Amino acid sequence: IVKPRRHVVHVWELNDAEAAELGPLLQQVTRVLAALVEPEQVYVTLWSHMHAVPGHIHFVVQPVTAARMEEYDGLHGLRLQLAMFERRDAMPADEVNAIAARVRAHLAAG
């Protein structure tokens, strides 16, 4: 997940500095994930609702492999994400934390 440090409900509320940082950061994170996971695609999806009320914006950055799409009968994009949500299919927290640590290390190394 990539999100602004400051509480923001809408993208248009980002100040110029935050907006200028966001695009390159998403590019860097997806580039590192592509190198680490070798996915078919890295989805970047903006979410902000919590119980039908806009909350803090955050971008879900999700590497998706061909094998994962095959598990879901070839679904991709939003349909794949919805099917995964319906099944409550998520990586275990320890795996997410391990990948996040590797991404942070790559970003810190430049």
Regions found by a protein language model. Give the residues of each.
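HIT superfamily nucleotide-processing domains
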Residues: 1-110
